[in-house]
């Protein structure tokens, strides 16, 4: 089976609205990267969210369950990282985005450990999320020196911040670009490094991992 999959238009408007209502019902979001918010569904709500997600992907993964699921509201795009808690499939469900086009980028480079790519000019008090640590990019599988992302793609995905990301992501190459469409479910293997882009001002969605 492919390790990057898009299930197009698999969610109805009612499905999307149910998820948005579920997200809004969570009154204790966690702060992430300043203005970003993470909403964790617990108890009966968590069970219902997992059930509704797994129903949509059951035909692809009949023997899998949801290991982790949460909602997020992002205004500051997450940089390149991996979520390799375990080798499995990770999913993204777009729920809403404001202006522009939202993308999730999958890179050719992979990792067998949880990492976050942090530039050398990071602030002294910077602490990577989820204790992923700072990694020398040359230790990442598939990384090689040189610029791999085209100027055209750089301007498209990072816009006026491309001059910064061009250097930060030097040596990395884009394997797949998923453009957010409400109604889709996007899945990819957790081994891949991935990132958001600077092409929209805000987006809401669901992230889940299978066990």
Residue ranges and their predicted role:
Residues 1-80, 103-104, 117-147:
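Non-heme Fe(II)/2-oxoglutarate
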